[in-house]
Curated annotation (Swiss-Prot):
One of its GO terms (molecular function) is methenyltetrahydrofolate cyclohydrolase activity. Pfam families: THF_DHG_CYH, THF_DHG_CYH_C. The lineage of its organism: Bacteria, Bacillati, Cyanobacteriota, Cyanophyceae, Synechococcales. GO terms for cellular component: cytosol. Belongs to the tetrahydrofolate dehydrogenase/cyclohydrolase family. NCBIfam families: PRK14186.1. Its EC number is 1.5.1.5, 3.5.4.9. This is Bifunctional protein FolD. It catalyses: (6R)-5,10-methylene-5,6,7,8-tetrahydrofolate + NADP(+) = (6R)-5,10-methenyltetrahydrofolate + NADPH; (6R)-5,10-methenyltetrahydrofolate + H2O = (6R)-10-formyltetrahydrofolate + H(+). Homodimer. GO terms for biological process: L-histidine biosynthetic process; methionine biosynthetic process; purine nucleotide biosynthetic process; tetrahydrofolate interconversion. It comes from Synechococcus sp. (strain RCC307).
Length: 292
């Protein structure tokens, strides 16, 4: 039987509809729509595409996008001053620093300048600490998108063995914390793990965020596992691929996220959701998507 398709595009569209309705109903009380500021430094082409996609998503749900594009030669102090300005802007509810930033800039120092309440990407150390403590706050977008995909497809992590490949602060570490909070038994493996396949074959839920095209094949996957592919890479011959060799894995997995169309759309949706939630809390409005 083919693996269940973990369709991020479909779920993202559903959540966008819910957010659009929540914004429309909250406007009379709030007096303005939610605002998301995306700070981009330099002219990295991939970052330009990502920012354009986020702006389109904002328009679909009724958020105002406050773009801030600075030259690659902009000094660190000037960028930090711009972030402090956005922190004080009453029309801005969420702020995202588009990563990566140009060489020579300290992205960690930039993230520290964010008002944690406006941290749309969930990467401020205070918000990561809240995640560790199980306290409410903005959540890292990609792991939160993975959890939403699992939940919406009836995959409950409770009591299951979950393995996360990758230990980055962007995906791997918060992913492990979210799965643990959902009562999974979690193992994190990485580039220095001996006999990787011995660990991954134990996983009932396998989240792959290794950043290596086609790293995971059928020999890494337990039959019946739910496999979430976070990776996305451009192939030399054109098109996109993930960290998972999907043609091999699809026949043996119970569920598999496609690339593209799986985790990627959910990352953008969770960015919007963090912003809409911050706006809702500011004006004492109901949570737009309880459970997500």
């Amino acid at each position: 039987m083919p693996a269940q398709r973990l369709d991020g595009r479909q779920l993202a569209a559903q959540l966008e509809e819910v957010m659009a309705a929540a914004i429309a109903s909250g406007l009379p009380r709030a007096g303005r729509p939610p605002g998301l500021a995306v700070l981009r430094v330099g002219d990295d082409p991939a970052s330009g595409v990502y920012v354009a996609n986020k702006e389109k998503a904002c328009a679909r749900v009724g958020l105002v996008s406050h773009g801030a594009h600075l030259d690659a030669a902009t000094p660190q102090a000037e960028i930090e001053a711009k972030l402090r300005q956005l922190n004080q802007d009453p029309a801005v509810d969420g702020i995202l620093v588009q990563l990566p930033v140009p060489a020579g800039l300290d992205d960690r120092a930039l993230l520290l300048e964010l008002d944690p309440a406006k941290d749309a990407d969930g990467l401020h150390p205070l918000n990561l600490g809240r995640l560790l403590r199980g306290e409410p706050g903005p959540r890292s977008c990609t792991p939160a998108g993975v959890m939403a995909l699992l939940r919406s497809n009836g995959i409950d992590p409770a009591g299951k063995r979950a393995v996360v490949i990758g230990r980055s602060i962007l995906v791997g570490q918060p992913m492990a914390l979210m799965l643990q909070a959902a009562n999974a038994t979690v193992t994190v493996v990485h580039s220095r793990t001996a006999d990787l396949a011995a660990h991954t074959r134990e996983a009932e839920i396998l989240v792959v965020a290794a950043g290596k095209p086609g790293m995971i094949g059928a020999d890494h996957v337990r039959p019946g596992a739910a496999v979430v592919d976070v990776g996305i890479h451009r192939k030399p011959e054109g098109g996109l691929c993930g960290d998972v060799r999907s043609a091999e894995v699809e026949p043996i997995a119970s569920a598999l996220s496609p690339v593209p169309g799986g985790v990627g759309p959910m990352t953008v949706t969770m960015l919007l959701l963090n912003t809409v939630r911050a706006w809702s809390q500011r004006f004492d409005l109901p949570d737009p998507t309880p459970g997500y």
